[in-house]
Design a protein with these regions (language model features):
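Structural detector for internal amphipathic alpha-helices that build alpha-solenoid repeat scaffolds
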Residues: 1-6, 28-43, 52, 61-72, ...
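Amphipathic alpha-helical scaffolding segments comprising HEAT/armadillo-like alpha-solenoid repeats
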Residues: 2-22, 41-54, 73-84
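Short inter-helical turns and helix N-cap capping residues of alpha-solenoid HEAT/ARM repeat scaffolds
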Residues: 26-27, 55-59, 87-88
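N-terminal, positively charged, Ser/Thr/Ala/Gly-biased leader segments
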Residues: 82-147, 290
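Short, surface-exposed loop motifs enriched in S/T, G, D/E and P with embedded aromatic residues
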Residues: 118, 275-280
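Feature captures the catalytic cores and cofactor-binding loops of soluble hydro-lyases/lyases
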Residues: 137-275, 283
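Internal alpha/beta core interface subdomains
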Residues: 279-290
């Protein structure tokens, strides 16, 4: 069940709130587990139930841990502040954590070096290649819609079923090498702005988001040229888009990508030999990915 503020999230939050408060019991989920799961819902319907149990001796500390990593609290901030003023130790801990930015500092830094397997798409890829208009009906279902990515024949891309299903088997073979896959292209993401295009790329190149189904984040996208709108959309999704010469990167290559956070210098190596160098568009992108 998704986090956030859709109808399903409301039902999820209301049920977990009742269990966390002890108003309902569930053989599969304890009070503590219910509070922990509420704390994974990112904001919205989960915020008030978490605040309501901050004074609970059994689950208050668990609720505090969830709130520490929740940013989308809006006016409920004042409720936590008021509880802290009244001496609630868990509320005080949440306020201090927010002040210290632990929601950010607790996350792992972007690795200075990472091994990637190249999924190379030669020539120009536009957003309709990545998220075909005839498949627009499936865009809300990211894993389903991703099956249509690159479904039309093009050099080097082995569609499972030309015109209907993209190179899923080819991508699975690359994933079997054990590294994250990098989407690599000559010109990437031209055409109209489509978040669905980014979603499809990240489905195959990103990592699961804890407690959020059917969506991924992170991933690396390398392009000799990346269209500005696509670059920004990748950035917003927590991916690492880098403009770098991809001429010596071929389908299936295992490369090492080094990023120096201090200088924003990017180095790509194949078999230990430097094959391309570049600069991040902004050093801040390392913090954005984190």
């Amino acid at each position: 069940v998704p986090a956030g503020v859709d109808d399903a999230a409301k039902v999820k939050a209301e049920f977990l709130a009742k269990v966390a408060k002890g108003e309902e019991s569930c053989a599969l989920i304890s009070k503590g587990k219910a509070a922990e799961l509420l704390g994974t819902m990112l904001g919205g319907y989960n915020v008030k139930p978490l605040i309501d149990v901050l004074g609970d001796a059994e689950v208050g500390a668990i609720a505090a841990e969830g709130l520490k990593k929740t940013l989308l609290v809006f006016d409920f901030f004042h409720d936590v502040a008021e509880l802290a003023k009244c001496g609630n130790a868990n509320a005080k801990a949440v306020m201090q954590s927010w002040a210290d930015g632990e929601w950010f500092t607790s996350r792992p830094e972007v690795p200075a070096s990472q091994k990637l397997t190249v999924f190379k798409v030669t020539g120009e890829t536009n957003t309709d290649d990545l998220s075909p208009a005839p498949d627009a009906w499936s865009r809300p279902d990211i894993p389903l819609h991703a099956l249509a990515m690159l479904k039309n024949p093009r050099p080097g891309i082995e569609a499972d079923e030309a015109g209907s299903r993209g190179p899923i088997k080819q991508l699975e073979k690359l994933a079997a090498k054990g590294n994250l896959i990098a989407y690599v292209g000559d010109v990437v993401g031209t055409g109209s702005s489509r978040k669905s295009a980014t979603n499809s790329v990240l489905w195959f190149t990103g990592e699961d988001i804890p407690f959020v189904p059917n969506k991924r984040f992170g991933g690396v996208c390398l392009g000799s040229k990346i269209a500005p709108i696509f670059f920004n959309t990748m950035e917003d999704a927590g991916a690492l888009p880098i403009e770098i010469d991809c001429g010596q990167m071929d389908m299936g290559d295992e490369i090492e990508l080094k990023v120096d956070a201090a200088t924003a210098k990017v180095t790509a190596l194949k078999n230990g030999t430097v094959i391309a160098e570049s600069q991040l568009k902004t050093a801040v992108i390392m913090d954005e990915v984190r």
